[in-house]
């Protein structure tokens, strides 16, 4: 099993706090550090700082040394595909080839409205996702002069300068996430290096992985060439007493302090890695049995660096 830390900087993190978290993950031995790509502050206080994903990833490219970095996921509604391809290639070069990129159709309508970004219906957002995937792949892998004629974007005589090298890879490690429905499964099979199933039980993750495998077979791709991962909420502690303290802090941050603690825990126990190390290890084993090869540990206590160190010890076995 491989492990990455997934963070939610829209919870009000400054760049300095994000860097502390990334360096803690690097010191803990986790293989990758991902951040969300949002423009509004949630959950928690609505007026906290919300840093730009790719601006901060450029900073992390220079301020970390070994850990892989990336977005999970960047909505295609936020950026023009050609410009996005160049941003990713630039940050990858800055990092020495450590960038991974997750792409998605976008879902948070209020964020779009607040910044004047169009938020089309779901079908059109998926159309734009598919065109974006075709364009960024083309810019990263096709020779100069390549063109693309889509409904939403057209390119002619395309070239990317500097040319993308990605440390000898044809393109950066590309992740698509979701529930693995038929259209998404087809896009994973066509374009992605990794499929990420978010917030699911092991049984539901296994079902989604099966749909991706069938989509790969349908186009003649080896299903084993797709990394299978899961994004899983995490809340762990060395002792039950410490765990309850972290539960209290998290509930207070989310404004759920008045909710029943037992009910709060019960609602998450079948989807999260939660508890003391023994309980957490059992959950990891259940995910592995479902076919998960990499876990994105979704951290909702981003200022608790001691928990990150504990996650590193769990990852090391």
Task: Go through each PLM region and give its residues.
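Active-site-adjacent structural elements that line small-molecule/cofactor binding pockets in enzymes
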Residues: 1-317
């Amino acid at each position: 099993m491989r492990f990455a830390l997934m963070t939610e900087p829209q919870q009000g993190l400054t760049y300095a706090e994000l860097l502390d978290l990334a360096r803690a993950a690097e010191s803990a031995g986790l293989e990758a550090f991902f951040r969300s790509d949002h423009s509004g502050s949630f959950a928690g206080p609505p007026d906290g700082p919300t840093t730009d994903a790719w601006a901060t990833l450029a900073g992390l490219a220079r301020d970390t040394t070994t850990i892989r970095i990336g977005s999970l996921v960047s909505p295609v509604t936020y950026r023009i595909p050609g410009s996005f391809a160049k941003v990713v290639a630039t940050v990858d070069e800055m990092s020495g080839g450590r960038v991974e990129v997750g792409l998605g159709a976008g879902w948070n309508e209020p964020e779009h409205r607040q910044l004047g970004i169009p938020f089309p219906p779901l079908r059109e957002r998926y159309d734009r996702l598919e065109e974006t995937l075709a364009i960024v792949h083309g810019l990263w892998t096709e020779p100069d002069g390549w063109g693309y004629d889509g409904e939403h974007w057209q390119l002619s005589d395309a070239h990317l300068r500097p040319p993308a090298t990605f440390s000898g890879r044809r393109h950066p490690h590309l992740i698509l996430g979701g529930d693995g429905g038929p259209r998404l499964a087809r896009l994973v099979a066509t374009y992605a290096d990794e499929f990420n199933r978010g917030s699911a039980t092991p049984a539901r993750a296994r079902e989604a992985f099966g749909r991706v495998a069938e989509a790969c077979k349908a186009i003649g791709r080896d299903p084993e060439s797709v990394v299978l991962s899961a994004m899983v909420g995490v809340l762990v502690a060395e002792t039950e007493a410490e765990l309850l303290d972290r539960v209290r802090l998290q509930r207070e941050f989310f404004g759920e302090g008045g909710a029943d603690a037992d009910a709060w825990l019960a609602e998450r126990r079948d989807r999260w890695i939660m508890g003391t190390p023994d309980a957490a290890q059992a959950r990891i084993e259940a995910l592995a049995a479902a076919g998960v090869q990499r876990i994105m540990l979704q951290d909702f206590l981003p200022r608790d660096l001691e928990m990150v160190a504990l996650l590193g010890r769990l990852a090391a076995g």
